[in-house]
Amino acid sequence: MENFIQSFLQERGYTVNDKAQTIIKSCDNWYANRCIEDFHQRKTVQGTPYELSRMNFAKRCCADDANLCEIAEVNGGENEAQHEYLLDMLEKNRFLSMYRKQIENVSAKGTAACYVRLDQAEIAQDGSVSGGRIRLNYIKAENFIPLTVENDEIKEAAFAGTELKGGKVRTTLVDFILDKNGNYVSETNVFDEYGTRIPELTTVVQLGEVKPFAVLRNAEVNNIDNMTGYGYPKLWGAIGVLKAVDLCFNVLYGDLDKADKLVLVNELLCKFDELGNPITPNEQLKKTFVMLGGEKLPEQKDLVQEINPTIRIDDITKAFELCLSLLSMMFGYGTKKYSFENGQIKTATEYAGERQDSMQELNKQRAEAENYIRDICRAILWFSNTFQGTTWNVDEEITADFDDSYVTDRQSELESKRADALSFSSIPKLTIWYLMDKYNLSEEEANKIYAEGQVDIDTDAETED
């Protein structure tokens, strides 16, 4: 976060949490696979600088975490027109793809946010607004500033972002503050590349009691001191293990890098050119054979001696296993989230498909995600009613369907539905549901096929007319 943003908020009586921003920045460095100066940069015993290789396993962990909380569809309520409107607005704002990125960032840095804004709206002198296009702004943890938190609920917040406009850097700060009547007031301030506020671009808009922003946080309790309003960044607790994973990889890489076979050859066996250089049959042998004088051989009685460096694969594998088990526990999915089995590394998504003991952790995060989606949709509906003259039901129950393909075995699920349909053949609905799921049909299409008897469920083949 820019220093002038912090100073501006402090002048208005707010405190910016420096410690939280420091922790978030540290987690972001690991997530972005940046070189950590005090860890990855090393020196040899001769003082020659070198850099450790990096596996970028932090990104892998966060991506797998996000896979388990991916959304399949948002349900906008029983009103079909309202449902379609919400889906259209979310699609125009690329919500599903941006949510996928945000949930991954939440795993890494603990927090993400979104607020609703109006583009190209008409603002009257009294602050009233009409028209415009409803847009969603997606915010990363480093650009989110909680201002007022009550019972762990964020009541007031500010959001900062930097962009390039007309070749000039502009930083925008948007805050949402409650007035004495319990209604939100939005104030937008714009700063130039030097951190100077541009007064003519400042706008103040009177909103209502519906919160115009939503915050997505890690469902796990944040036990880090002085991080009120922020979610727990999982990478923060895993940094030590991530270092160990990189060290394991560098040991393996070092062994492989020095694993080329060497052959020490007595000079008595070599031919030499006119300059005294040994002649080898081809270029490859120059890398393999090393000519030494007879007195330099480890055993002078030997004319040829092979050196085959050892690759410590068993020791390295055990070290990797320990690190991956610790990393699994750090992310809350037991000790087998990542493991070597039959010579293969199993990812979190593969493991969760076989074992269901991670579902409790997952369900907590899904509940948090559903609240986030519900808050965004309510804000969209309120903006539409207030500024565009619609009459949507803001209190309509809004839910999200999550993609369970990562935590369920689809083939086993289909077999179970097929068995139910065969066992209870007197209940046509079971067969229709099976056909819908198996062949990705609508209920109308499945009913038609069932009525015409086009599918024999015993063989899953179409019957002949």
Language-model features, listed with the residues they occupy:
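Extended, helix-rich architectural segments
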Residues: 1-148, 153-154, 462-465
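Extended, charged amphipathic alpha-helical segments
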Residues: 201-353, 357, 401-409
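Short acidic alpha-helical/loop segments enriched in Asp/Glu that coordinate divalent cations
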Residues: 332-346, 375-396
